[in-house]
Amino acid sequence: MPFIINTDSDRAEMLAAAGAASFNDLIADIPEEIRLKKSLDLAPALDEMAVRRQLESLAARNRSTAGYVSFLGGGAYDQFIPSAIRAIVSRSEFYTAYTPYQAEVSQGTLQAIYEYQSLICRLYGMDVANASMYDGATALAEAALMAMNVTGKERIVVAGQLHPWNSSVLSTYLGAAGHSPVVQNSVEEGVGSIASLRGMVDGTVAAVIVQQPNFYGCLEDVEAIGAIAREAGALFIVSADPHSLGVLEAPGAYGADIAVGEGQPLGSAQSFGGPYLGIFTVREKFVRKIPGRLVGMTKDRDGRDGFILTLQTREQHIRREKATSNICTNQALNALQAAVYLSLLGRQGMQEVAGQSLERAHYLAARIVEIPGYSLRFSAPFFREFVLNTPVHPAVIVERMLEEGIFAGIDLSVFGDEGLLVSVTEKRTKEEMDRFALLLSSF
């Protein structure tokens, strides 16, 4: 929109309406010593073409997966996004800043969310999914709070290696609510020790949390962890990578009470870290305890199918002391992207994408461990991420690989850990992986 300056008559009219004789009269309450008494040192005005050129020059200094080969992971993945997704979600019926406070008026939006919920339930093998949460980390924290609400217990135990940032968000949520700190069992060969977990989980534990695959990319023994939780009367919470469910068993199949996840890989761009999508699913018996929005299907007075927001347990809708959550929105557009993604790929497509990631990750790992000085840090099975022991500090590799147009992975020393976390998605080609391995051999 072009900038149209206020005219003298415009300013006079506004001052008169404000009951001020002059601009100085209008700001009389601002102390003289803090008023700006000189012009701002601004660059000269530019025309539109010059502004565009300058902004494009600044943007070109960014490094993104559009111009680099990415082996970054740790919760945000360089997945292929079919062009049909952008075409569908960019339609004006969906792509809007409007929040449907009279939700039932927006039947199309509600149906889209309903379809998302249905698809997520099928993917995770669970009974009920909500309309979405902010991201995977907040979904996990809300799951822990829900478990405490359901069981009346205070303790949360983490089995295996949770993403450090998710762990931090979890601790922030629980600490702010006055709950006990989270405790974690020991990690051996990349996965949680079942023996140490068994000694930590008792009748005082509200929930046992596991990330599958875990932060290191390794596969936890979810069957054993779930059994320990059930024996102690604790809820079993699984934070699952949605893409892994193309080849791994769904959380519902091995007894998860609550299953959450980060939905970014389902059609959302990495986009500087957000907005992302929090997946939240539960068993049917917990439906009245689920946080956030829930879309249901009903009949109108003429017998036609319709969609509504149902079981609204947010504090905006019911008494605060009765509310299950104070989440004030959801990620509807990202949820729509996930629904379109899942619909386009279908069961077979999800299996193919997950299978390609699995095969390529193991191909690359096998290539790298042949290079002197490199080895896998853990012997546990992995899906599409693995941790490397390296002959030089991972930070050196990461920095030098940038010069070659490659994001080499995550230097785990930023988390106080050791090794280089490498992720492989279906986008990586054999040529890219072979070149990466060749460059690693130069260190």
Curated annotation (Swiss-Prot):
Cystine pairs: none
Catalytic activity of the protein: N(6)-[(R)-lipoyl]-L-lysyl-[glycine-cleavage complex H protein] + glycine + H(+) = N(6)-[(R)-S(8)-aminomethyldihydrolipoyl]-L-lysyl-[glycine-cleavage complex H protein] + CO2
Signal peptide boundaries: none
UniProt keyword terms in alphabetical order: Oxidoreductase
EC number: 1.4.4.2
Example of a GO MF term: glycine dehydrogenase (decarboxylating) activity
Short name of one Pfam family: GDC-P
CDD domains: GDC-P
SUPFAM superfamilies noted in UniProt: PLP-dependent transferases
GO terms under biological process: glycine decarboxylation via glycine cleavage system; nucleoside metabolic process
Functional summary from the UniProt entry: The glycine cleavage system catalyzes the degradation of glycine. The P protein binds the alpha-amino group of glycine through its pyridoxal phosphate cofactor; CO(2) is released and the remaining methylamine moiety is then transferred to the lipoamide cofactor of the H protein.
Annotated family: Belongs to the GcvP family. N-terminal subunit subfamily.
Subunit organization: The glycine cleavage system is composed of four proteins: P, T, L and H. In this organism, the P 'protein' is a heterodimer of two subunits.
NCBIfam families assigned: PRK00451.1
Name of the protein this chain belongs to: Probable glycine dehydrogenase (decarboxylating) subunit 1
Lineage: Bacteria, Pseudomonadati, Chlorobiota, Chlorobiia, Chlorobiales
Gene: gcvPA
